[in-house]
């Protein structure tokens, strides 16, 4: 499995609402709608989505991007091309990880000129090229491309990684870095 890590710009400490916070931000109506739409598309009810948007605007970090917070539920959905894991946290925030469905891609017909994760096999070694792994926290999305190989259905290995991509609403990320955790895990942090 591949790891992705996103670190949010907001403080993990609650901020008293009676004092203006340096972490408070002003979101446009379009930004609020985009965040809310992302949250509700993954099953967060509208009222909870509005609550989370308000907390974000007032400088509160959501549980989904607070170090040490653990999800209270997780669901997984597989499609022909991807495996999507939605982790839900106590405050209602989510973390959605999307990686290629390697096994299904190996069985799918391959055509020339397609983009995204491409599969080929040579002897007992299976290769996936130009794959993408992404984590979406609604206000922050980040991920990277990578190549992957597997010999005899074991020894999975990420053979190349980068470039990365990201999108953030109401903030900025810096100091992007890759950390190789193991042969099969690479983490992108910011």
Report residues per predicted region.
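Generic marker of residues within folded, mature protein domains
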Residues: 2, 73-77, 134-136
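C-terminal segment of classical bacterial N-terminal signal peptides
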Residues: 2-11
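A generic structural signal for short, non-catalytic loop/turn and secondary-structure boundary residues
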Residues: 5, 78-80, 181
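N-terminal propeptides/leader regions of secreted preproproteins
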Residues: 12-119
């Amino acid at each position: 499995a591949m790891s992705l890590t996103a670190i949010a710009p907001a403080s993990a400490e609650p901020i008293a609402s009676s004092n203006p916070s340096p972490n408070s931000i002003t979101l446009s109506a379009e930004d609020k709608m985009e965040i809310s739409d992302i949250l509700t598309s993954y099953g967060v009810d509208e009222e909870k989505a509005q609550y989370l948007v308000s907390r974000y605007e007032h400088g509160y970090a959501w549980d989904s991007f607070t170090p040490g917070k653990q999800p209270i539920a997780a669901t997984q959905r597989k499609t022909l091309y991807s495996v999507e894991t939605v982790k839900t946290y106590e405050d209602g925030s989510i973390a959605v990880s999307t990686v290629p469905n390697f096994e299904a891609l190996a069985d799918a017909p391959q055509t020339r000129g397609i983009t995204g994760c491409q599969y080929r096999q040579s002897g007992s070694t299976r290769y996936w090229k130009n794959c993408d792994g992404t984590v979406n926290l609604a206000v922050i999305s980040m991920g990277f491309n990578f190549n992957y190989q597997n010999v005899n259905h074991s020894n999975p290995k990420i053979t190349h990684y980068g470039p990365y991509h990201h999108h953030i609403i109401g903030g900025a990320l810096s100091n992007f870095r890759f950390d190789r955790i193991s042969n099969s895990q690479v983490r992108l942090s910011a």
